[in-house]
């Protein structure tokens, strides 16, 4: 059966751990696995702008022996009303995997329903699961075992990073706290799914409007832009309510003395995170960005070699 990676809880705890272990191996030996040798092709489609996702998938696919066919959605029939089901059937005859960065999650679900090759969510409005694999790899590098750690996220609790962190981190046994302003809490269905997964792994999920409480004793502090792509004109005030959730030196000082800070990038320096923290000793942001390459390669190997 073809496996897809559309949201973080598509992986069981054991499957996630296997991928993270493989990511660590591939970081040490980048050319040790070549499931795409030939080269075999991977469709990499972008409906949204990208820097890290584009470079990391393109380079990673090459390191796996393959060829990335990178296009923007508007340059294909995806932008001219061809059904996603028809596109999935056609692409499945050309390539060995489909990597897609798009808008609504329902588009990925529709593509995966018909595709006979793996479909990978490279970011949607609702989830960013490839980023969270890289985040977990980075945390494991700095902290060792993930199980039992405390991760606190600060910012828009309804955005794709908050959703994926809840699902992905609790899968690894990490306790997650989402600190967010009133009116920006996570989607109830995602929160329920995260709590259900947490029950199975011994983790927990908490949502709070108190940033200081969330930071106290945390092992990992994570933030993201206050305005995600496509939200620029949604009519909501995405500045004033978020100032108490800025990741700054004072907030970091409330966390564990060996805490690390993550940000998926791009960052709006001086808004959700200060220069002092981003460039300071607690920052693991640059390792996190690099690990997109290794984590995504591991995911592709896992999907393709099944």
UniProtKB/Swiss-Prot annotation:
Keywords: Amino-acid biosynthesis, Arginine biosynthesis, Cytoplasm, Transferase. The keyword Amino-acid biosynthesis applies. Pathway: Amino-acid biosynthesis; L-arginine biosynthesis; L-arginine from L-ornithine and carbamoyl phosphate: step 1/3. It is found in: Cytoplasm. Its EC number is 2.1.3.3. L-ornithine binds at residues 160, 224, 228-229. The keyword Phosphoprotein does not apply. GO terms for biological process: arginine biosynthetic process via ornithine; citrulline biosynthetic process; L-arginine biosynthetic process. Coiled coil: none annotated. GO terms for molecular function: amino acid binding; ornithine carbamoyltransferase activity. Reversibly catalyzes the transfer of the carbamoyl group from carbamoyl phosphate (CP) to the N(epsilon) atom of ornithine (ORN) to produce L-citrulline. HAMAP family: OTCase (MF_01109). This is Ornithine carbamoyltransferase. It comes from Mycobacterium leprae (strain TN). The lineage of its organism: Bacteria, Bacillati, Actinomycetota, Actinomycetes, Mycobacteriales. The gene is argF.
């Amino acid at each position: 059966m073809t496996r897809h990676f559309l949201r973080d809880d598509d992986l069981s705890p054991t499957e996630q751990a296997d991928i993270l272990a493989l990511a660590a191996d591939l970081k040490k030996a980048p050319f040790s696995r070549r499931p795409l040798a030939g080269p075999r092709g991977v469709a990499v489609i972008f409906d949204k702008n990208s820097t890290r996702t584009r470079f990391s998938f393109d380079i990673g696919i090459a390191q796996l022996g393959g060829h990335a066919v990178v296009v923007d959605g508007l340059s294909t029939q995806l932008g001219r009303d061809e059904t996603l089901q028809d596109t999935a059937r056609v692409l499945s005859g050309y390539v060995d995997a489909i990597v897609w960065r798009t808008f609504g999650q329902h588009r990925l679900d529709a593509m995966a329903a018909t595709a006979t090759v793996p479909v990978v969510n490279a970011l949607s409005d609702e989830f960013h699961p490839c980023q969270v694999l890289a985040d977990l790899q980075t945390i494991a590098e700095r902290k060792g075992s993930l199980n039992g750690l405390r991760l606190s996220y600060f910012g828009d609790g309804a955005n794709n990073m908050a959703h994926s962190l809840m699902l992905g981190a609790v899968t690894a046994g990490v306790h997650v706290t989402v600190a967010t302003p009133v009116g920006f809490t996570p989607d109830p269905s995602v929160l329920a799914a995260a709590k259900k997964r947490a029950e199975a792994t011994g983790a927990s999920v908490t949502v709070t409007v108190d940033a200081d409480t969330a930071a106290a004793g945390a092992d990992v502090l994570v933030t993201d832009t206050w305005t995600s792509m496509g939200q620029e004109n949604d009519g909501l005030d995405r500045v004033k309510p978020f100032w108490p959730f800025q990741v700054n030196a004072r907030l970091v000082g409330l966390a564990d003395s060996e805490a690390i800070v993550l940000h998926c990038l791009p960052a709006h320096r001086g808004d959700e995170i200060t220069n002092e923290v981003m460039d300071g000793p607690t920052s693991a942001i640059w390792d996190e960005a690099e690990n997109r390459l290794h984590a995504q390669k591991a995911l592709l190997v896992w999907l393709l070699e099944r």
